[in-house]
C-alpha cells in the first residue's frame, strides 16, 4: 500500500471515529501529515509504512508542536525493518508513541486502549499497583508467597505494588493467580508519559533570517515566537497570557504560498488557532481563512489587539 493510500485510510478511520481531520500536509518538509480533533483531544499524526524512517529531528519537532498547540504527537505505521508492528502494542520512537492501524482502530473506534508497550528488553504492561496490593491483602497472601509463585524476589513484587511495570508474561500470571484484571491501559492520548522514557530536548531552532522582521514585529506587540523547521507554517506565535495562538507564515505570494496558506487554515480549524501569512504584496484578503497581510502593513502594527483584529477581519472578510 502506498503511503498516500495509508494516510487516506487513517483519515477515513478517524472521521468514522468522530474526529474532525485537517487536509493532508502535502508539502515538504513536513513533520506531520494530518491534524485531528475529537472534543478536547487534538492529535498531530505522522503516517509511515516503515517507522524506522521516523528520525529524531522530526520527533523533536512533533513534540514541540504538540506542546505549542496542546496536541498529542503520534505515529501510525505498519512495520519496522525487521517485523510488523504487533496489534495492541505501543512502541516509541524519539519520545513519540507509535502503533499500528489495527491498534488505532481499537483505540479510536472501539475505544479499547492498548495495554502493552515495547521497551528495551521486551514487551511490558503497566500494573495497577494499588489494586495489586489491595487484592494481595484481601487474599491474605504474603509478599514472599506471591514472589515464589511468580519466580521473582519479594523486592520485585514490592516494586510492582509501587507502580513498576511487569513483563507481559508476569502480568498474565498475576491476573491468573488473582483472577482479576490488573493491567492499566497506556494513556496514549496523554503522550503515554507514564511509560515513555525521557528524551533529551535540543534547543529550539532559530528563526529563518528572512523572517527576522516578522519575528521582530510579533515580539514587539507581545507575542512569543516559536519557529518551526518542518511544518506548513514558519512559526507558532502566542501572546504573553498564552490565550491567543497564531500560525504564522511568510514568503512572496505564489502558488506554493497559497497552498501553504490553505493547509494552515485547515490545521488551524482543527487546533482552533488563527493563521496569518505575511506576503510582499497581494490584492487578496485571505486564503480559506488564513489572513493575508502585506509586509509593510504588518510592520506598522502596534499591539496584539490590533494584530488580532486585523487577522479576524481579513479571515472573515
UniProtKB/Swiss-Prot annotation:
GO terms for molecular function: DNA binding; DNA-binding transcription factor activity. Residues 132-189 form the HTH cro/C1-type domain. Keywords: DNA-binding, Transcription, Transcription regulation. Pfam families: HTH_3. Residues 143-162 bind DNA. Gene3D superfamilies: lambda repressor-like DNA-binding domains. The keyword Transcription applies. InterPro entries: Arc_TR_HTH, Cro/C1-type_HTH, Lambda_DNA-bd_dom_sf. HAMAP family: HTH_type_cro_C1. This is Putative HTH-type transcriptional regulatory protein NP_1320A.
